[in-house]
A protein has these predicted regions:
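A structural signal for short loop-to-beta-strand junctions that line the ligand-binding cleft
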Residues: 102-114, 240-250
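Short, low-complexity disordered leader/linker segments with a strong preference
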Residues: 1-29, 325
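Ligand-binding pocket segment of bilobal, Venus flytrap-like solute-binding proteins
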Residues: 73, 82-85, 168-230, 312
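Periplasmic-binding protein-like
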Residues: 276-293
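Bilobed "Venus flytrap"/periplasmic-binding protein-like clamshell domains
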Residues: 29-55, 59, 117-184, 301, ...
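Pocket-flanking alpha-helical
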Residues: 46-50, 62-103, 121, 176-181, ...
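C-terminal lobe and pocket-closing loops
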Residues: 206, 211-271, 306-307, 314, ...
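Surface-exposed aromatic
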Residues: 290-302
Length: 325
């Protein structure tokens, strides 16, 4: 990490947002932990990587395919990634050593509060599933191992009074694998936490002979907040967000963050934060959920972990004060 910081600060010290082109600079590589190819983290991470590579001379950034939030946090904790996408609940667990991070705290700081993640509980017509309680006895994918989806899915199932390991047959599949299994009749429902629309869910909704159905679950927010704090919020996915689902459906939201190691260099984090806000339109062209990257959202408490001082410095310049302790 120290070698990475030293090299990167050297190349960005005098950098504005001009296209990279200096051939005499040693290339510095940045790894951005994202998610699976069928989700939203990966394309947004790819967009961010392209921006860093384009506008910061000497930097070559790469979006890495991962299992998602928990894997990204573990990569940062192991010094194998410099920036990571994560859901706020997974980040909270990591910094406090809870759940999958028991005995393995990760020193993190918030780079930006990015966009809200929408829990999807997805099935198709003919499955016999019309409510959360109908998941009992069914074959259900709760998300890939070491993913934020799995963490939130397990908590949501418990919020409705069910045991995810006893009351259903649980599969641990990525969103792309879950959609494929649902198409093939190998599972009855899937959980997925991501932006709206998520490409894989859109693909399912467009499959001939399949009519998508989103299951209401927003009422689980109260029990989740009682146990885990105000990270989880009741919201709704609007009608026609996916082809064939013509109802508004209640859901659980948890915000997505970009995080960095707590010891990341202030100037590095300042530059990345500045780039994201001042070239936001390029990220929006990659996925519309980047439109949620707003200055006002940074100070709402959506992130349960402090901001990195470098990010806070840029935000202060823009009139926004955030927690750094």
């Amino acid at each position: 990490m120290r070698r990475f910081i030293a090299g990167l600060v050297a190349v960005i010290a005098a950098a504005g947002f001009t296209a990279a082109g200096a051939q005499d600079k040693k290339t510095t590589r940045i790894s951005i932990g994202t998610g699976g190819t069928g989700g939203v983290y990966y394309p947004l991470g790819g967009g961010l990587a392209a921006m860093l590579s384009k506008y910061v001379p000497g930097v070559e950034a790469t979006a890495e395919v991962t299992a998602g939030s928990i894997a990204n946090l573990q990569l940062i904790g192991g010094g194998k990634s410099e920036v990571g996408f994560t859901m706020a609940d997974a980040a909270w667990d990591a910094v406090n050593g809870f759940d999958k991070f028991t005995g393995r705290k990760v020193a993190l700081r918030t780079l930006v509060v990015f966009y809200p993640n929408r829990m999807h509980v997805v099935t198709v017509e003919g499955s016999g599933i019309n409510s959360m309680k109908d998941l009992k006895g069914k074959r259900v994918s709760t998300g890939a191992p070491v993913s934020g989806t799995e963490v939130t899915a397990m908590r949501l199932i418990e919020a409705f009074g069910m045991d995810p390991n006893k009351d259903m047959t649980r599969e641990r599949l990525s969103v792309a694998e879950s959609v494929s299994a649902l198409k093939d009749g190998k599972i009855d429902a899937l959980f997925w936490v991501g932006g709206v629309p998520t490409p894989s869910i859109t693909d399912l909704a467009a499959t001939p002979g399949k009519t998508i159905k989103l299951i209401d679950h927003g009422d689980g927010a109260e029990n989740m907040r009682k146990k885990f704090g105000p990270i989880y919020v009741k919201n709704k996915i609007l009608a026609n967000a996916y082809p064939g689902e013509t109802r508004d459906t209640t859901n659980i939201d948890v915000w997505n963050l970009l995080v960095v190691p707590a010891d990341a260099d202030d100037n590095l984090v300042y530059q990345i934060t500045k780039l994201m806000f001042e070239k936001k339109d390029e990220l929006v062209r990659v996925h519309k959920d980047a439109g949620f990257l707003e200055l006002a959202n940074q100070a709402t408490g959506a992130s349960p972990i402090p901001f990195h001082p470098g990010a806070a410095r840029y935000l202060k310049e823009r009139g926004i004060t955030v927690n750094v302790k």
